[in-house]
């Protein structure tokens, strides 16, 4: 059982849950041009400060509920490596041994810290043994090394620890004795290590192994990490190697993740148009072959916030609604969308729902020659049959000088949060 999320963890989850984050991705025209020309996006979508905030909130990894939640649907350094999931017994052994190794080998981490300072060209500011999850600059990928060194220049150097179940009772010398005799060097099974057969043991890291790719993805996600330390535990032995950053590998990772980020942003920009009632209505006309709704039913669906896309009814305000277009009208109208911010779902609370329609409000104001009709319509005002200017939502009378709503008015609250500019 995991402890309940704290207020800070809940805030991180609400922002970086993969589906929510992907839906929030957006680009300005200048950023999109930057990507097309140079394959970079400035400023970075996720700042370093935010990355460290997420890391701090997810420490404990598998024992932390937030860490488990943020991994769902997100590409991680270990999952991207293509390896087969470990058996539960081997995984439990590895996790337990990693924790013991970190606690019992202070001298090892002191030596690795000195090497990290040499590679980074600056001193270690902090050694973090209980590491959480790092989010990439684009926010779509993540990595959870076993430990890391926070450097004085703001960079981080990861440490990846492997405790193979198969070598729990095998020393390095015993492992080498079991190797063949035909070759000078042999791959060490279940690791990314290559070792010589004869003479003092000399280890290398194989670049084609999943562990190597995992470490490179960690260095990519952690941005300017110049090196990763690969530590493999045998019985009575530890093998520790420095794995330099592969710039070509990291560039390819950035290109792939950046392309996915731009695709999300483009899709989101296309969806924004359906917050407008006229665009939702047009979707039914443009896809007439995909539905059998009459004009009155289309009007009702549009007012409910629905549009038609690729044969599916979707909500212009949330992701929770998806229904095949030809389904019965009554089913579409009754289908709930939980946590949807579409105002049509609160229409039973409005003073005059007929003027939920943006254009209707504007027409009523223009017909009565009201000054500043465009601004008044955005603020929810219309002119009633008696010639009074009032809000369609909470029924408050107003004017150019006074545009007040009731404090609990759902339209007023949505307008403040979402800066409504188009037809609901």
From Swiss-Prot:
UniProt entry tagged with the keyword Ribosomal protein: no
InterPro entries named among the record's database cross-references: NF-kappa-B_Signaling_Reg, PDDEXK-like_dom_sf, Restrct_endonuc-II-like, Viral_alk_exo
Gene3D superfamilies: 3.90.320.10
GO CC field: host cell nucleus
Subcellular location: Host nucleus
Assigned keywords, A-Z: Endonuclease, Exonuclease, Host nucleus, Hydrolase, Late protein, Nuclease
Superkingdom of source: Viruses
UniProt-listed Enzyme Commission number(s): 3.1.-.-
Gene Ontology MF: a single term: endonuclease activity
Keyword Nuclease: yes
Enzyme class, spelled out: hydrolase
Complexes and interactors: Interacts with LEF-3.
Chain's role: May play a role in maturation and encapsidation of viral replicated genome, by promoting DNA homologous recombination. Exhibits endonuclease and 5'->3' exonuclease activities. The endonuclease activity displays a specificity for ssDNA in vitro.
Family designation: Belongs to the baculo-herpesviridae alkaline nuclease family.
Protein name: Alkaline nuclease
Native species: Orgyia pseudotsugata multicapsid polyhedrosis virus (OpMNPV)
Higher taxonomy: Viruses, Viruses incertae sedis, Naldaviricetes, Lefavirales, Baculoviridae
Gene (name only): ALK-EXO
């Amino acid at each position: 059982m995991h402890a309940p999320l704290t207020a800070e963890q809940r805030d991180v989850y609400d922002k970086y849950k993969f589906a929510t984050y992907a839906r929030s991705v957006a680009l300005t025209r200048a950023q999109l041009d930057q990507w097309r020309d140079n394959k970079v996006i400035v400023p970075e979508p996720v700042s370093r400060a935010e990355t460290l905030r997420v890391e701090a909130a997810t420490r404990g990894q598998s024992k932390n509920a937030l860490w488990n939640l943020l991994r769902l649907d997100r590409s991680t350094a270990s999952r991207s490596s293509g390896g087969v999931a470990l058996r539960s017994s081997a995984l439990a052994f590895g996790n337990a041994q990693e924790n013991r190794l970190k606690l019992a080998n202070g001298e090892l981490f002191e030596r690795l810290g000195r090497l990290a300072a040499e590679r980074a060209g600056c001193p270690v500011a902090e050694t973090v043994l209980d590491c959480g999850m790092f989010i990439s600059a684009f926010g779509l990928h993540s990595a959870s090394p076993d430990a890391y060194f926070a450097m004085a220049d703001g960079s981080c150097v990861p440490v990846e620890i492997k405790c193979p179940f198969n070598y729990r009772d095998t020393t390095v010398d015993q492992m080498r004795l079991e190797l063949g005799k035909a070759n000078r060097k042999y791959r060490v099974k279940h690791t990314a290590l290559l070792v010589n057969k004869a003479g003092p043991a000399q280890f290398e890291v194989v670049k084609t192994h999943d562990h190597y790719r995992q470490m490179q993805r960690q260095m990519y996600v952690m941005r300017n990490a110049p090196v990763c330390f690969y530590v493999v535990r045998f019985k009575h032995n530890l093998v520790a190697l420095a794995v330099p950053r592969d710039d070509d590998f990291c560039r390819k990772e950035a290109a792939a993740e950046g392309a996915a980020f731009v695709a999300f942003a483009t899709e989101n920009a296309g969806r924004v148009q359906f917050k407008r009632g006229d665009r939702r209505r047009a979707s039914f006309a443009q896809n007439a072959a995909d539905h059998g709704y009459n004009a009155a039913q289309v009007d009702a669906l549009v007012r409910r916030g629905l549009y038609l896309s690729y044969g599916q009814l979707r909500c212009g305000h949330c992701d929770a609604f998806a229904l095949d277009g030809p389904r019965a009208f009554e089913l579409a109208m009754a289908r709930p969308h939980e946590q949807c911010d579409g105002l049509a779902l609160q229409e039973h609370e409005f003073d005059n729902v007929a003027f939920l329609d943006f254009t209707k409000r504007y027409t009523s104001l223009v017909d009565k020659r009201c000054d500043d009709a465009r601004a008044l319509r955005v603020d929810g005002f219309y002119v009633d049959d008696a010639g009074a200017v009032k809000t369609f939502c909470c029924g408050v009378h107003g004017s150019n000088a006074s545009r007040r709503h009731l404090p609990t008015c759902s339209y007023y609250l949505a307008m403040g949060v979402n800066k409504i500019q188009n037809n609901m």
